A protein has these predicted regions:
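Short, leucine-enriched amphipathic alpha-helices that occur as contiguous helical runs
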Residues: 5-13
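Short amphipathic alpha-helical elements of helix-turn-helix/winged-helix folds
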Residues: 14-18, 30
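Short capping segments at the starts of secondary-structure elements
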Residues: 17-25, 36
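Short, amphipathic alpha-helical interaction segments positioned at domain boundaries
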Residues: 67, 77-116
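Short, positively charged loop/turn segments that connect secondary-structure elements
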Residues: 32-56
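Alpha-helix C-caps/helix-loop-beta hinges
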Residues: 19, 68-69
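Short amphipathic alpha-helical interaction segments
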Residues: 50-67, 73-76
Length: 116
C-alpha cells in the first residue's frame, strides 16, 4: 500500500483481506465514515446502481486508483446484504441486456482483495 494512503483506508483494505470479502453494507456498518451521505456509486451506461447513501469520503475511497488496484468488485447474492441488515428497495440486476436496462437496477456487489 502506498505511503500516501490514509490509515483509515488501509484499515478497510486490511479488513476485507482478513474476512475474504465484504459487501458495501458490511463495510458501512463496520466503518461508519463510508456511509451517512447522499452519494451514489453507479454505472450509468448499463443503468446499474452499485450502492447509495455513501459519504463523499466513502466515494473517494472506492474511486481511488490505489484502492481499486487492491480491491476487486464482483456481483454477489442480495442475501449477503440482507444478512448485513441493509438492502436497496429496487429491482435487482440479473443479466444486463445489451444497451443496459431502461430502468435502473441494483447490482449487489462485494469487494475482495485482488490476486497478485
Amino acid at each position: 500500500m502506498g505511503d500516501d494512503m490514509k490509515q483509515e483506508w488501509r484499515d478497510v483494505i486490511g479488513y476485507v483481506a482478513k474476512v475474504g470479502g465484504a459487501t458495501f453494507a458490511e463495510l458501512e456498518n463496520r466503518f461508519g465514515w463510508l456511509g451517512g451521505g447522499d452519494q451514489t456509486l453507479e454505472l450509468p451506461g448499463p443503468n446499474l446502481l452499485i450502492w447509495t447513501g455513501m459519504s463523499a469520503e466513502g466515494v473517494a475511497f472506492y474511486m481511488d486508483r490505489g484502492v481499486r488496484d487492491q480491491l476487486e468488485p464482483s456481483a454477489c447474492s442480495w442475501l449477503l446484504y440482507a444478512d448485513d441488515g441493509k438492502m436497496l428497495r429496487m429491482p435487482i440486476a440479473k443479466r444486463p441486456p445489451k444497451g443496459g436496462y431502461k430502468k435502473q437496477r441494483w447490482v449487489p456487489t462485494m469487494l475482495s482483495v485482488r490476486d497478485g
